[in-house]
Each structure stands twice: as structure tokens, then as C-alpha cells.
């Protein structure tokens, strides 16, 4: 990957001038001038997904200039580098190959002179055999009973992805009850343990190194709870499995290393649901549905790696995001799925985007003088409409939004889905076109009221509009289409990082807090006053000690 400051390209300078021309142009103007705007600014994927980006403050000239930026920063070369196994995560000297985990074409992918696909396929086969034994009831707990509950213990990428997917694919789930524990707050594990039976519970401990503080603290608490009933350490092997590469530590914990499922250093945590970390997904929906999830992602991988940038969906969405973040000063993006099963999707890509592109140092090691990753947030519709849409519609901040919905619901109860989708369609229309003062006044006249007598309220009912949105309409949320949707966002994030000249696949920002916590932890072991930190931290620790006494 090349190290190119995007602001030094001629395309960036052209975009800056173009912004001066576009900043006062409204979305309503753009639609008024072009009756075919939807056709020109939308695209389908596999007849399963429609991406409508017409309600954005862009023209064909905007997109052309953004494409020029992608060319000048060598996006095509960056894509090739990732897919070919080059070590593009240079700060950790690692390849970035989550795409290999879902490489259903099974074409060789070489890392350090070795094809990784045989090992990928071997772990998949091992997960298949293990999951089928659990799901079928063939696997028995220490009292001879079949497993009824699975508890995934992990944090970050070892939790967010599997939790999001198992929730999104609930219509496909089997009889096993799934639970996820991530927080080191003892409340999280305690509340889950209240719901499960040690005789019929399987724990998955998801930690590559088997040293992650939060995960191992929870794992040891789960083990202690289990042994308080089982009373024999040999029974741990029937109720615990590991998603890890540290065979020594796994064995010392009491887990049979035959039930340790590996992944590799070229699998980043926030891109790991496709790996052994996805074992909880397989246990929830079955191996065949997991393969469909992989296949959907692989289909998007092929689209991303082979489609020209002008028609490439992840690239288009990435470029539009850069346009708003760097030229309009939009600091956030909202992800708004109109599907209750997708209630963790925004949280998943909050990590996916902010941990990937939340960087202020470029690939040359210099502080950037432009915007990198946006703040990502969101909630399912229509809940969000009754919470924060007020700010999106009438606030002082521009918040570009992605609206996501399935055309076909898994729960066709009376007219629920039509009402849900009517809101989905209405919100993007309202955000784009707003409501003028004239329309507000006419509405009062239609009600037999004199607008001049209501001047005190009219301004508050005006909507400026011109708020940008993308609409992503899926035919139905299936394992395949969900896989494609996740990969769409993954590649959008990669594209933005490549163009913005940052390292997307490390996360050094999580380290300092962990180091300081490890230093502070021993200081909390007694009641002595602390004076080794700044006055604020000292004051907080000492008040904590006083109150806990």
C-alpha cells in the first residue's frame, strides 16, 4: 500500500473547489433537475440488496471527483494488497485476511509462502463435527444430559460479532439457548449463571491468547461456579471449549485441546466472526446456515475486488462518507436498521469503524490534518424516531444516515411490517425534502385556522430538509444476505482507511488504558490512601476506598 496524503492530491483540491459550488445546493434541487436521479444513483447487488444513494448532496461530478481521489491514492492497489495476503497491517507485521475465512471458491491465498486455505477448511470441518455433536444431543455433560445452553465468554470482537449475528439470525435458531458474557463487571456473568444449569451448559472461552483480562476473569468465575456443583476438575472438559491459539494455557484451564478451535494472527478481532470465534453462531443456527453467511460475504468480497470503482458499492458508500466527513464537517454517521433482529448491528459497526479508523497518525507516522474515522451510532427504527431523530431532522448538526430494512419480514403479523416500512420510506423522504413554511401555513388553512394567528408556532414546524441518507433495502434478511451486508460495511471501512492513509487493522488506542488499569489494580487491594497519580485520579481512588470500607 502506498503512503499518500490525500489532501496533497489534485483530486482533493478539486473536491474542495467543488464543495464551494455544492454547499448551498439542496437535495430537492437535485431531484427537481433530474427525473431519473434514483436510477442514476442506486444499484442492486445479486438481486438481494438495493442501495439507494440518490438522497445525498452529490452529483455525477461529485462522484467523478471522489473516484479521482480513489485513483490518486491507489485504492485499487490497496485492495489487491489485502486480497493477495500482503502484510498491510504494518505496525503488527500481519496480513489482513478475514476474506480467506469465507473464501468459498477455495482459491489459494498465500501468506509467507504458504496457502492458508487447507488450515481454514480444517478448522471449519472441526467446528462442523463439534457443533453437530452438541446440537444433536450426542455430546453429553458430566451427568449424561444433553447440552441445552451455550455461554460465549469473550469481549470486543469475540463478543460483538457473534452476538450481533445470532440475534440477527434468530429466525434460524435451533433449540439451544445462547448467552453472551463480555463485561468484567461481575453482574454480567452472575446474571447469566442464574439462568443456566451446570449439568447442561457449555461455555465457549473466546480469547486468542487466553490471557484477555475480562474474558479470563469471567471464565474462571464460570469454572468455579461449575465446579461448585460438579466437584471434579475432570468434568470441565465436557462443559468448556476454547476459541484460542494458546494450547498450553487452554490445557491448564482443564479444557481438552481437542476442543480448542484455532484462528490466526491475520484475523483481526473485529473481523473474526467468520473464524472459530463464530462457533457460537454455528451452535445457534447450524453449520449450513453459517456456510451461507460465509457465502454471502464471499459474494460481496468478489464484488468488491473485481467491480470497477464507479459501480463498486463499498467504494461508493466509502467515498460519500469521506465527502461528508471531510468537506461538510459531518462528524457522525447513524446506522438505523428497521428490523428488530438487527438491534445490535449499529453497535457492531461502532466497533468495526471506530476501532479501525479512529486514528490521528497516518501510515508515515505523522499526525493528520484532515478527518479520519467518523463517530458511529444508531438504534433500530422505529424506536429511534421517538428518541433522537428530532436532532437529525431539526438539529444544528449534519448526521448522514444509513437506513436498512428487509422487504420481507420473518414475522408477518397483520400490518406490522407495512407500518414499519412506511416509516422507513417516510423518514428518508422527510430528511431529504423537509417541510417549508408555505406548506406549514397551508396546513393551518386547510384546518380552518389563520396562520397569522399562529406565527408563534409556525417556525418550529418548519423542516429544512437537505439531510443526507442512504437506503439499503434487502429482499429478506437471510444468512446469505446478512453476510453480504456485513462485508459491504467491512469493505467500506477498509476503503476509507486506504484513501485516508491510515492503518485500519491495528488498535493501539485500547492499550494505554489497559496498562494503567494493570498498574492501578494492585493499589486497590488495601485501604491505604493513594498519592501516586494526578490529584483527580488519587481523589477518585481514595473516595472509592472510603465508600467500599
Curated annotation (Swiss-Prot):
EC code(s) of this entry: 5.3.1.9
GO molecular function annotation: carbohydrate derivative binding; glucose-6-phosphate isomerase activity; monosaccharide binding
Source domain of life: Bacteria
Pathway annotation: Carbohydrate biosynthesis; gluconeogenesis; Carbohydrate degradation; glycolysis; D-glyceraldehyde 3-phosphate and glycerone phosphate from D-glucose: step 2/4
Top-rank EC class of the record's enzyme: isomerase
InterPro entries xref list: G6P_Isomerase, G6P_Isomerase_C, Phosphoglucose_isomerase_CS, SIS_dom_sf, SIS_PGI_1, SIS_PGI_2
Protein name in UniProt: Glucose-6-phosphate isomerase
UniProt organism field: Citrobacter koseri (strain ATCC BAA-895 / CDC 4225-83 / SGSC4696)
Lineage of the species this protein comes from: Bacteria, Pseudomonadati, Pseudomonadota, Gammaproteobacteria, Enterobacterales
Amino acid at each position: 500500500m502506498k503512503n499518500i496524503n490525500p489532501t496533497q492530491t489534485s483530486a482533493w483540491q478539486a473536491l474542495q473547489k467543488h464543495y464551494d459550488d455544492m454547499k448551498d445546493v439542496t437535495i430537492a434541487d437535485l431531484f427537481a433537475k433530474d427525473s431519473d436521479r434514483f436510477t442514476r444513483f442506486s444499484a442492486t447487488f445479486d438481486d438481494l440488496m438495493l442501495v439507494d444513494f440518490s438522497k445525498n448532496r452529490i452529483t455525477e461530478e461529485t462522484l467523478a471527483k471522489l473516484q479521482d481521489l480513489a485513483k490518486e491514492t491507489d485504492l485499487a492497489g490497496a485492495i489487491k494488497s489485502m486480497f493477495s495476503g500482503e502484510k498491510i497491517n504494518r505496525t503488527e507485521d500481519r496480513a489482513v485476511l478475514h476474506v480467506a475465512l469465507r473464501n468459498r471458491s477455495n482459491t489459494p491465498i498465500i501468506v509467507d509462502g504458504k496457502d492458508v486455505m487447507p488450515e481454514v477448511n480444517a478448522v471449519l470441518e472441526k467446528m462442523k463435527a463439534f457443533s453437530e455433536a452438541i446440537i444433536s444431543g450426542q455430546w453429553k455433560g458430566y451427568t449424561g444430559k444433553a447440552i441445552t445452553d451455550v455461554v460465549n465468554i469473550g469481549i470486543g470482537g469475540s463478543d460483538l460479532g457473534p452476538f450481533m449475528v445470532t440475534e440477527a439470525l434468530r429466525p434460524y435458531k435451533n433449540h439451544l439457548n445462547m448467552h453472551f458474557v463480555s463485561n468484567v463487571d461481575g453482574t454480567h456473568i452472575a446474571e447469566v449463571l442464574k439462568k443456566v444449569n451446570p449439568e447442561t451448559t457449555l461455555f465457549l472461552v473466546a480469547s486468542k491468547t487466553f490471557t484477555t483480562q475480562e474474558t479470563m476473569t469471567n471464565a474462571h468465575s464460570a469454572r468455579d461456579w461449575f465446579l461448585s456443583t460438579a466437584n471434579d476438575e475432570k468434568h470441565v472438559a465436557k462443559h468448556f471449549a476454547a476459541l484460542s491459539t494458546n494450547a498450553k494455557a487452554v490445557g491448564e484451564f482443564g479444557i481438552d485441546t481437542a476442543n480448542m478451535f484455532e484462528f490466526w494472527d491475520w484475523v483481526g478481532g473485529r473481523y473474526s466472526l467468520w473464524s472459530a470465534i463464530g462457533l457460537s453462531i454455528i451452535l445457534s443456527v447450524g453449520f449450513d446456515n453459517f456456510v451461507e453467511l460465509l457465502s454471502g460475504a464471499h459474494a460481496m468480497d468478489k464484488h468488491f475486488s473485481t467491480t470497477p470503482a464507479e459501480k463498486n458499492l463499498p467504494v461508493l458508500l466509502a467515498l460519500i462518507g469521506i465527502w461528508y466527513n471531510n468537506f461538510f464537517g459531518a462528524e457522525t454517521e447513524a446506522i438505523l436498521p428497521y428490523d428488530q433482529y438487527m438491534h445490535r448491528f449499529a453497535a457492531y459497526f461502532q466497533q468495526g469503524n471506530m476501532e479501525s479508523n479512529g486514528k490521528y497518525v497516518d501510515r508515515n507516522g505523522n499526525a493528520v490534518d484532515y478527518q479520519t474515522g467518523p463517530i458511529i451510532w444508531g438504534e433500530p427504527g422505529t424506536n429511534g424516531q421517538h428518541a433522537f431523530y428530532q436532532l437529525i431532522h431539526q438539529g444544528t448538526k449534519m448526521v448522514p444516515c444509513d437506513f436498512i430494512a428487509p422487504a420481507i419480514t420473518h414475522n408477518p403479523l397483520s400490518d406490522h411490517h407495512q407500518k414499519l416500512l412506511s416509516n422507513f420510506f417516510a423518514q428518508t423522504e422527510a430528511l431529504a425534502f423537509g417541510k417549508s413554511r408555505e406548506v406549514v401555513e397551508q396546513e393551518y388553512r386547510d384546518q380552518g385556522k389563520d396562520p397569522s394567528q399562529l406565527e408563534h408556532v409556525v417556525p418550529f414546524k418548519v423542516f429544512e430538509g437537505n439531510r443526507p441518507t442512504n437506503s439499503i433495502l434487502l429482499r429478506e434478511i437471510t444468512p446469505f444476505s446478512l453476510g453480504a451486508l456485513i462485508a459491504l460495511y467491512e469493505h467500506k471501512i477498509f476503503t476509507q482507511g486506504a484513501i485516508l492513509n491510515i492503518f485500519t487493522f491495528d488498535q493501539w488506542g485500547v492499550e494505554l488504558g489497559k496498562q494503567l488499569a494493570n498498574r492501578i489494580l494492585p493499589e486497590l487491594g488495601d485501604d491505604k490512601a493513594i498519592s501516586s497519580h494526578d490529584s483527580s485520579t488519587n481523589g477518585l481512588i481514595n473516595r472509592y476506598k472510603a465508600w467500599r470500607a
